[in-house]
Amino acid sequence: MRNFYSYNPTIGRTYVYDNKFYKNLGSVIKNAKRKQHLIEHLKEEKQLDPLDTFMVAEDPFLGPGKNQKLTLFKEVRNVKPDTMKLVVNWSGKEFLRETWTRFMEDSFPIVNDQEVMDIFLEANLKPTRPNRCYRFLAQHALRCDPDYVPHEVIRIVEPDYVGVGNEYRISLAKRGGGCPIMNLNSEYNNSFESFIERVIWENFYRNNVYIGTDSAEEEEILLELSLLFKVKEFAPDIPLYSGPAY
């Protein structure tokens, strides 16, 4: 007698396979993980929604404007352990007329309206001896009396560690910021001394900066100090040249 209920799969059965019912196992797992990550990301964003009511300050260095760098000096300084040395003395050689004149002629050759949006003091620190393992320290003060004479060396008290690239950058802009100047080059050429006092220090801080290390030995530091001007330039009201192109 023939058995109609045979469990042998080869008897009386035909299978037709359609590729649309088959998917790559890797893509299935990736899609599932992608959906899971999206759900988790949406949950995290929802937890941060209450923070939308708060405001944070962005780094002004990354804002719009053209950067013009004035290198004040580059020299080697010796720093003893547990002390910090003054690296900025605004009444000294950092303000030589030759340095400023070359900077103004190279950086602002175009005669148009400009605005000094911010000035950054930038200190680049490098060890002079190889295979030294220490970190750079820095401390600065923006506000001080005009007749204040800073100490050349101070003790280390709550300093800041210099960040990535051993660069220490400080914004010198006062509250409100900005220094609109009509034709910066002519302002400088009229009177060098009045330009520094009236334009720069009336609108920006004359700060004090101290540099040190956390080393237990005396270290030699290659210090490069520069001022970085963030300048906004305005287009002239009328074309500089008249012709078919205009």
From Swiss-Prot:
Taxonomic superkingdom:
Viruses
Which residue stretches, if any, does this entry annotate as coiled coil?
A: none
UniProt keyword annotations, A-Z: Viral occlusion body
Does the record bear Nucleotide-binding in its keywords?
no
GO cellular component terms listed in the entry, alphabetical order: viral occlusion body
Q: Which InterPro entries match?
A: Polyhedrin
Which Gene Ontology terms cover its molecular function?
A: structural molecule activity
Report the family membership.
Belongs to the polyhedrin family.
Tell me, in a sentence or two, what this protein's role is: Major component of the virus occlusion bodies, which are large proteinaceous structures (polyhedra), that protect the virus from the outside environment for extended periods until they are ingested by insect larvae.
Spell out the protein name for this chain. Answer: Polyhedrin
Organism the protein comes from: Agrotis segetum nuclear polyhedrosis virus
Q: What gene codes for this chain?
A: PH
